[in-house]
UniProtKB/Swiss-Prot annotation:
This is RxLR effector protein PSR1. Keywords: Host nucleus, Secreted, Signal, Virulence. Residues 1-20 form the signal peptide. InterPro entries: RXLR. The gene is PSR1. It comes from Phytophthora sojae (strain P6497). The keyword Signal applies. Transmembrane segments: none annotated. Changing E39A: Leads to the transition from disordered structure to ordered structure and abolishes the function in cell death activation.
Amino acid sequence: MRLTYVLLVAVTTLLVSCDATKPSTEATAVSKRLLRFVEAADEEERRIDFSPEKLRKMLGDETYRLKKFGKWDSDGHTFDGLKHYLLLSDSSMVKLRNMYKAWLEQ
């Protein structure tokens, strides 16, 4: 009777050890796939660099301003949406926002 228990334990151990490699390989493949997905998620939120230096440069350099307006438009930023980013108590920022509105209407 002890021999049957020893054989049963040996067969069970063999079966368990053979199946143990498959789930770990599948888990690794899933984790790599999820890492690739996380990299793509960064593109969801597009940000504009609203540093004061760049905004002032936009006021003085028309070529730079038009390039930035094109980027804002391609990123989906609306005229009304800019009030969340620009300090509208500053008259030059109001002027810049109005320039963007005029550019959008062209």
